[in-house]
Regions:
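Serine-hydrolase catalytic machinery in alpha/beta-hydrolase-like enzymes
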Residues: 5-97, 189-196
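Primarily recognizes the serine-hydrolase "nucleophile elbow" in alpha/beta-hydrolase
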Residues: 82-146
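Conserved alpha/beta-hydrolase "acid-adjacent" motif
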Residues: 160-166
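Catalytic active-site module of serine/aspartate enzymes centered on a nucleophile-bearing elbow/loop
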Residues: 185, 193-220
Length: 220
């Protein structure tokens, strides 16, 4: 189901897409990455795959993307929008166990506003940007070391924003985090023709990990 949602707290209208299977295990609220909105094939495919596996999803456009802009102009704005969406979800879907997160930037935003995501069971990242592209020395988000909410990092092994050595070191230092490598996948888990698995297979593999993670924490 696609619908427009007016965010009272920010005074803007955004597009959302909600997929709810019969008797879902939980609901995963996730935001898109910086460069592409909820109509991107990656977001749509993840939603449809999770639907088939029994997990409800709620995804949404940030306002800048809704207005056709390429990139966000302010961290504060996207943070406030994520919090406003969560407030709406808590009101309308309070019968579900709720998980949050997102693709790349969307996942990072969820970590910045974690203190405002009440009733959250866990964070799920679809390719978390651990460092600047090709710059493992430029770690972004040291604050995530303070998060105690369970976290699942789903990272492509060929992601230029998530080199293996630094990613494994950082995740190992977190309070309650799991790391799963999608072998051969780049930032959106796309692969080369030589890779044993294609992007669709890696998305399916990642969604299996999401289901397993949610089963561990949806009652917590």
């Amino acid at each position: 189901m696609e619908k427009k949602l007016f965010l009272v707290d920010v005074g803007e209208e955004i597009s959302t897409r909600i997929l709810i299977p019969e008797n879902p295990l939980c609901m995963y609220v996730f935001a898109h990455g910086a460069g592409a909105g909820i109509d991107h094939d990656f977001i749509i495919t993840v939603q449809k795959t999770l639907f088939k596996k029994g997990i409800a999803t709620f995804t949404f456009n940030f306002v800048y993307k809704e207005k056709g802009k390429k990139l966000p102009t302010s961290k504060k704005l996207v943070d406030e929008e994520y919090k406003a969406v969560w407030k709406y979800v808590l009101k309308e879907f309070n019968n579900y166990s709720l998980f949050a997160g997102g693709k790349s930037m969307g996942g990072r935003v969820s970590t910045r506003v974690i203190d405002d995501l009440s009733e959250i069971k866990g964070l799920i990242f679809l390719g978390f940007p651990i460092h600047s592209p090709g710059r493992p020395d430029k770690f972004v988000g040291a604050y995530i070391k303070n998060i105690r909410t369970p976290m699942l990092f789903l990272q492509g092994s060929k992601d230029p924003l998530s080199y293996k050595e630094i990613t494994e070191k950082i995740v190992a230092e977190l309070h309650n985090a799991q790391l799963y490598w999608l072998e051969g996948g780049k930032h959106s888990w796309e692969t080369t023709k030589k890779n044993p698995k294609n992007q669709m297979q890696l998305i399916n593999e990642a969604c299996d990990q999401i289901v397993a993670f949610c089963k561990c924490y949806y009652k917590g």
